[in-house]
């Protein structure tokens, strides 16, 4: 389950020193952190995966074998829809970019409450739903 931990993805913006410092800070708040490598071709760890529920991750194929996902169900984005992995879960609802029809259909078929939102404008700067949110 991801309910008891935070995954910190390394990237051009987050180096190991920063991730280690954040992990130490999270520990003072009673949260366990794990540092993950972001594979080449994935801009940021969180743009390549999103939480469907506490035990299920939507991920691009490049993150399918991420060690931090051990014990979780990993659902891969449909072919050609890698940006759809940048979902945002709010309680039991998953927000998905409205242009990712195959992903929306796949999640809906799993019984997930899916809300499509327009993301075309934010996608122009390589951003998605998680980039436009503040959450804990």
Task: Outline where the language-model segments fall.
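Histidine/cysteine-enriched polar flanking segments
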Residues: 1-136
């Amino acid at each position: 389950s991801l309910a008891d931990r935070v995954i910190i993805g390394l990237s051009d913006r987050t180096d190991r020193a920063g991730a280690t410092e954040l992990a130490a800070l999270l520990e003072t708040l009673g949260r366990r952190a794990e540092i993950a490598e972001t594979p080449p071709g994935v801009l940021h760890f969180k743009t390549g995966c999103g939480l469907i529920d506490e035990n299920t991750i939507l991920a691009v194929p490049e993150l399918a074998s991420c060690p931090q996902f051990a014990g979780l169900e990993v659902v891969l984005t449909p072919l050609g829809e890698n940006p759809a992995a940048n979902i945002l879960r709010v309680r039991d609802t998953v927000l998905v970019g409205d242009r990712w029809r195959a992903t929306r259909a796949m999640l809906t078929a799993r019984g997930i409450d899916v809300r499509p939102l327009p993301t075309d404008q934010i996608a122009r700067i390589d951003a998605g739903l998680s980039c436009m949110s503040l959450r804990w």
